[in-house]
Every structure is written in C-alpha cells, then in structure tokens.
Amino acid sequence: MQRTLSIIKPDAVKKNVVGKIIDRFESNGLRIAAAKKIKLSKCDAKAFYAVHKDRPFFNDLVDFMVSGPVVVMVLEGENAVAKNRELMGATNPKEAAPGTIRADFADSIDANAVHGSDSLENAVNEINFFFASREIC
C-alpha cells in the first residue's frame, strides 16, 4: 500500500470542483488518509517548490500557490503515486488525455488544478512537509 501527496490548487478550489476531484480519486481506488484546506504562506510555497527555485517559472508558481486556499491530501492505495499521476493527466491540460483531472478542470499549464508527488521518495518528503504522522489514518 503506497501513499502519495495531492494538492488541489487555488484555481480548482476557486471553481468549487474539490468534491469532483476527490470523487475521481475515490472512484479509482485511492483512499483519503488525511486532508486539510490551508492557505500557503509565501515562505511555505517557496520551501515546498524549492526544487524549482532556479527555473524561470518559480516566482509565478509561488505567487499562484499563495493566491488562494489549497486542499492538501494524503492519498493511499495500490501504486498510489502512479495512479494519482495517471488520474491527473499531463502538466499542460491541452496535452492531457480526455477524462483526466487536468483535461476536465484545468485552465492552463500554470493553473493546472492539481499537484501530485512524482515518486515514492518525493511522496514521503511532501507528505511530511504538510502532515504530522498523527494526522494520517
């Protein structure tokens, strides 16, 4: 049983599609082991996305992630990392397969509705960034 981190980004929260996105996870065998709605600080957003700090889009990404509330979740299930990435679709919603979260709910490569851990190792680190072990059940 794997765990992965999912973030429903400010654009999707603003569009009020959180429930529809959660339904995609649950109807595809991913269980929500923890969830909370938060407003990221600029400091937290910079720390979370530090791997991208030298990329040209870093400041825009940070500004976007602090533009409104997000929903952070720990998803649990068989091959959770890969399954979540499959459900999300390509980073650019124009390239995302029909029926994926990004194809259905994202507006652009920047406002792309969701974040998901890209590896098991990153999933552990990302989960620990947002959740104490006692919050996950």
UniProtKB/Swiss-Prot annotation:
Keywords: ATP-binding, Cytoplasm, Kinase, Magnesium, Metal-binding, Nucleotide metabolism, Nucleotide-binding, Phosphoprotein, Transferase. The lineage of its organism: Bacteria, Pseudomonadati, Campylobacterota, Epsilonproteobacteria, Campylobacterales. Its cofactor is Mg(2+). GO terms for cellular component: cytoplasm. ATP binds at residues 9, 57, 85, 91, 102, 112. Disulfide bonds: none annotated. The active site is at 115 (pros-phosphohistidine intermediate). One of its GO terms (molecular function) is metal ion binding. GO terms for biological process: CTP biosynthetic process; GTP biosynthetic process; UTP biosynthetic process. The keyword ATP-binding applies. It comes from Campylobacter concisus (strain 13826). Major role in the synthesis of nucleoside triphosphates other than ATP. The ATP gamma phosphate is transferred to the NDP beta phosphate via a ping-pong mechanism, using a phosphorylated active-site intermediate. The gene is ndk. It holds the Pfam family NDK. This is Nucleoside diphosphate kinase.
